[in-house]
Amino acid sequence: MEYFQVLLPLAIILVISKIFGKICVRIGIPQVIGLIAAGILVSVVEYIPGPMQDFFASGSPALTGLGFFAKIGVVLIMFNAGLDINVKQIKSVGLPATIITLAGVFVPMILGFIAACLIRNGTMIGLTHDQYFTNLFYGVIMTATSVSVTVATLQELGKLTSKVGTTVVTAAILDDIVGIIVLSVVIGMSGKEGGEAENPWIVLLKTVLFFIAAFLVGWLARKIFAAVERNFPHHRLLPVMSVALCFFFAYAAEKVFGVADITGAFVAGMVLSSNPEANYIERRSEIMGYMMFTPVFFANIAIANKFSLPDMNMLIFGLVFVVVALLGKVIGCGGTALLCKYSKKDSFRVGIGMMARAEVALVCAQKGVDAGLIHADIMPFIILLIVVSSLVTPILLKASYKEDKKKIDMAAAAVLAENAAKKKEN
């Protein structure tokens, strides 16, 4: 492939992605939706006769090149997700937040698995190996959480540091970690990424060994980074070395331990998240990612998967998938919060707060498509899930606090009236 063949499609994708992304931010929906919409628009070029048609045809050199950019993009997305992890907060996590996290991962996963079995296969008994792991992976996709919308809403309401706010933020951090581990284990057990299915215990052992090796290497890396930081404070050398560590972890995870490359990237971010310059590293790596690789990943979801109208079975399953994914978090997190002695209102708020999804759900789904575990037909419904959850979450959260706000306003009005009466008496 001549390298220049990818340059024109790349330029088109970057410009259209940025425009669509900004439009989505302006109207209050996640930027990733705009990036995917840009990919859908660009993918239509394949069907329009003209000089651009060959660039976006299936199997074209340009699409192959874009695929490589997309894979780097997904690694950087997960690296930044790992950098967002607050390790100190994890250490201070209480039992309720831990239980809520585990329920928030496994309840949606089990419900998703059951729904997939019943709708796609009509039964949960006598499934083949491939059917079992395909259905299980649909459940795994439901485990992902993105609380950026929730955090913004709670901040607006002045409730971010409340019991609900602290629980949601902490549970979301743990949710990411547990979800990524589950993803790696399921892909490894399925045998879809390069060979025969492995014994579950072997997969778990490899995953544990990877985490041990990663944190040992990470400990050494932190020492080196600290020395670099002392001699070159706020220098670009630090983010460059950080991204290099991310790529090394992603490679080692996939090649040496048989763990998903995105897990390696995520752990690299976690390892560096406690670095005093973590925010600086994250800003720089995000700039690098969102300048080129990340928009290509989201646009490539639409271009490579060739979205088309689903058949009736897929339509029914897709809509059920969205509903189960939404309710799974509310039931799993909200129900468990209730068992942990949270009030009914606070339990509902925790469930709603954990309901939102974003780019990590797309990353997990694309990993399943690439591994041959699931069909690309599910992707439009994951996009629908992101849109619906991003719009519904702030509405329901604000509604749940409406009565509290009324009581505060009434109490404030009563105090003002009392003060006014005292002034008149004087």
Protein language model regions, located:
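Transmembrane helical cores of multi-pass secondary ion antiporters/exchangers
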Residues: 1-426
